[in-house]
């Protein structure tokens, strides 16, 4: 396996995990703070995906911290494959949650013009943080996937 910055067990990898956790936690907190998120299934789905993202990122961040503290290499084929599959699934689920919530937010804001009755700024912030979470997860997935693909041949 190639030693790339951002791979599991590196400071760059830990930094990406912390960013993922931060963006997901902000999205979760902002959306949960709105009174009427439970009435819209797309907003509930965004909350579910951000909880999944928080759990995944926190777990992998703890593994990264442990690997950095004991100076253990996490770049073996089995571990990187596990991280790549987890990152890929989590990325797709998080992206679908952010897209679904974005669609409803645009509907409420631009099409129905109901922002006076709804906390549109909170919805938009939660959706933006959901997308930022996805964008910060993508490098982790791509680096792990590239590492697997390049070591196979």
UniProtKB/Swiss-Prot annotation:
<feature type="topological domain" description="Cytoplasmic">
    <location>
        <begin position="1"/>
        <end position="10"/>
    </location>
</feature>
<feature type="transmembrane region" description="Helical">
    <location>
        <begin position="88"/>
        <end position="108"/>
    </location>
</feature>
<keyword id="KW-0472">Membrane</keyword>
<feature type="topological domain" description="Cytoplasmic">
    <location>
        <begin position="71"/>
        <end position="87"/>
    </location>
</feature>
<feature type="topological domain" description="Extracellular">
    <location>
        <begin position="32"/>
        <end position="49"/>
    </location>
</feature>
<comment type="subunit">
    <text>Homodimer and heterodimers.</text>
</comment>
<feature type="topological domain" description="Extracellular">
    <location>
        <begin position="109"/>
        <end position="125"/>
    </location>
</feature>
<feature type="transmembrane region" description="Helical">
    <location>
        <begin position="50"/>
        <end position="70"/>
    </location>
</feature>
<comment type="similarity">
    <text>Belongs to the Casparian strip membrane proteins (CASP) family.</text>
</comment>
<dbReference type="Pfam" id="PF04535">
    <property type="entry name" value="CASP_dom"/>
</dbReference>
<keyword id="KW-1133">Transmembrane helix</keyword>
<keyword id="KW-0812">Transmembrane</keyword>
<feature type="transmembrane region" description="Helical">
    <location>
        <begin position="126"/>
        <end position="146"/>
    </location>
</feature>
<dbReference type="GO" id="GO:0016020">
    <property type="term" value="C:membrane"/>
</dbReference>
<dbReference type="InterPro" id="IPR006702">
    <property type="entry name" value="CASP_dom"/>
</dbReference>
<dbReference type="InterPro" id="IPR045009">
    <property type="entry name" value="CASPL-5"/>
</dbReference>
<keyword id="KW-1003">Cell membrane</keyword>
<dbReference type="GO" id="GO:0005886">
    <property type="term" value="C:plasma membrane"/>
</dbReference>
<protein>
    <recommendedName>
        <fullName>CASP-like protein 16</fullName>
    </recommendedName>
</protein>
<feature type="topological domain" description="Cytoplasmic">
    <location>
        <begin position="147"/>
        <end position="153"/>
    </location>
</feature>
<feature type="transmembrane region" description="Helical">
    <location>
        <begin position="11"/>
        <end position="31"/>
    </location>
</feature>
